């Protein structure tokens, strides 16, 4: 794929300012709408990655934009020392939809890696230390998540990893 000089200049700035976890990106995206994204040159693409599974509603969905805008106008984020009505209502909805047994609770995470780490901690709380991981899968970049990841190139630089996988 050929990119414009303007896009190439941005990619060079990226290279100079980022750690290349995924290597050099192929495009510099400027905006999105629904399932489509546009690069800084105005070229339109179908977003087949969905933000690697985090943009299930697509880009710029009006109801999502309205909900985010409303919440940002009230409180953007609070630490775990506090809570909000929205957090309580979201947790109650998850428990209701999951038909969770009485006494169940919710722990909201910032990322998939944090969710994996939490699952490891919860399983260890039972006294069981063995972990079953999905072969061929990527589980995240934290030490615990890398311990479950199949690809040796991701694992080797951080060994020794968690035992019992």
Label each residue range with its predicted role.
Residues 1-33, 87:
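Active-site-adjacent loop/helix segments that line or gate small-molecule/cofactor pockets in enzymes
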Residues 3, 44-132, 140:
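Glycine-rich loop-to-alpha-helix module at the N-terminal edge of alpha/beta enzyme cores
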Residues 9, 13, 67-70, 89, ...:
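A non-catalytic, amphipathic alpha-helix used as a structural packing/dimerization or gating element
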Residues 17, 40, 48, 111-112, ...:
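Fold-independent oxyanion-binding glycine-rich loops
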Residues 26-48:
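Active-site and channel-lining beta-strand-loop segments
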Residues 28-30, 97-101, 124-125, 157-161:
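Solvent-exposed alpha-helices and their adjacent loops that cap or buttress functional pockets
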Residues 32, 136-165:
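PLP-dependent aminotransferase-class I/II
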Residues 38-39, 57-59, 147-148:
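Short beta-strand-to-turn element immediately C-terminal to the catalytic PLP-Schiff-base lysine
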């Amino acid at each position: 794929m050929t990119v414009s000089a303007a896009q190439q200049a941005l990619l060079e700035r990226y290279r100079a300012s980022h750690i290349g976890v995924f290597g050099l990106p192929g495009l510099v995206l400027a905006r999105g709408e629904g399932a489509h994204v546009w690069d800084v040159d105005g070229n339109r693409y179908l977003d087949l990655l969905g933000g690697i599974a985090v943009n299930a509603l697509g880009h710029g969905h009006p109801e999502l934009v309205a909900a985010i805008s409303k919440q940002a106008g009230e409180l953007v984020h609070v630490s775990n020392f506090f809570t909000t009505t929205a957090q309580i209502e979201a947790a109650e909805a998850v428990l209701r939809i999951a038909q969770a047994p009485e006494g169940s609770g919710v722990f909201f995470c910032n990322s998939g890696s944090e969710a994996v780490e939490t699952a490891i901690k919860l399983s260890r709380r039972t006294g069981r230390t063995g972990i079953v991981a999905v072969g061929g899968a990527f589980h995240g970049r934290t030490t615990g998540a890398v311990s479950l990841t199949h690809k040796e190139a991701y694992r080797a630089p951080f060994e020794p990893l968690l035992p019992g996988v």
